[in-house]
């Protein structure tokens, strides 16, 4: 398998630390709201990676954390007169429901930050003892100047960090780029149950130490792959890498770093202030199916930017319709035990997760099905298509379910009358019946064998 490693800025042959247990850590959601489509693209991308690794290796340990303590969570809890656990329980449940409807597999473990406070405290104490962290007014900061390699992941140097970067400016820092490991509790924290005792007073962790603690707790000092969105490369992942390498001087933390590209909406950055903030829940409730959302994410290479717009949605719907239409040879669910996922699909994914090429292979399969004259061969091709598409997380419906086909006798009668009109050469009547059905929201598709597929648009 070849993957692009952000750390080396090059494609590399993937060589796991242990071929019997590949370890991967991915930054999951901060649960203060429903998951937006930018977050969800990342989840789908690493779901594909998880599926691929499970084919290539006997065991994969996939950790996707949940950030359940954060300023945004506290703000929501305060505004709704709730504690943080009430807020996070609601949105964790919603997140898992929504990702399920995108056909994402569950990770091996899904740790929560609040369940790993003791590990964070131990890491912070190590950083202080090793001279990589310091205390100012009950706040613990990481000293970036104590780590000469700081900036190697994002390609920034320390001087660049002073100007124009996303850095919290805190009084008492030795350097503007120093970041918080532990902060003292406020009265609001005490009220909302968002603080814990520590050697430096009651408080709560900084964001970056959370992922270092959870990855260490579940994967150890070193692991194979760290994934996340491009927006996390700096400062979050840079800070993770620094503090983990400093806490464990003989480690390198993650061997490979993978980052998926940005997502825009109508060529603009997604923002609540712009009114273009889209959640998966909104899209699902509006009638856009989970498979359509997933298909859109897979149609663009994970490292490239993706623009979400109405044309993209329509195109994905039409493409899936074409694939599903190829399944209408049989009314029964096909048993897939005697076929395997196409080698072409696996090869595409082994090449830096080239999902657009894998999608193209699915459409080539559809063409093969439509051209097949032998029914047994056609059914075999359909089974391979379904097995391969299922591996990508799509085509989990029958064609009847997808097109919402039912047994409306009036519609069937009109289709029969249209067929008779065509047989008798009365094409005007046949076209008129087609239009009548179209006005009722019924779309017809004539097959070469003389049968007609219909579905509700």
Swiss-Prot record:
GO terms for biological process: cysteinyl-tRNA aminoacylation. The keyword Metal-binding applies. Its cofactor is Zn(2+). A motif ('HIGH' region) lies at residues 29-39. Its main location: cytoplasm. Binds 1 zinc ion per subunit. Transmembrane segments: none annotated. Keywords: Aminoacyl-tRNA synthetase, ATP-binding, Cytoplasm, Ligase, Metal-binding, Nucleotide-binding, Protein biosynthesis, Zinc. A motif ('KMSKS' region) lies at residues 269-273. It is found in: Cytoplasm. Zn(2+) binds at residues 27, 211, 236, 240. GO terms for cellular component: cytosol. GO terms for molecular function: ATP binding; cysteine-tRNA ligase activity; zinc ion binding. ATP binds at residue 272. CDD domains: CysRS_core (cd00672). Its EC number is 6.1.1.16. It catalyses: tRNA(Cys) + L-cysteine + ATP = L-cysteinyl-tRNA(Cys) + AMP + diphosphate. It comes from the Bacteria. InterPro entries: Cys-tRNA-ligase, Cys-tRNA-synt_Ia_DALR, Cys-tRNA/MSH_ligase, Rossmann-like_a/b/a_fold, tRNA-synt_1_cat_dom, tRNAsynth_Ia_anticodon-bd. Monomer. Belongs to the class-I aminoacyl-tRNA synthetase family. This is Cysteine--tRNA ligase. It comes from Ehrlichia ruminantium (strain Gardel).
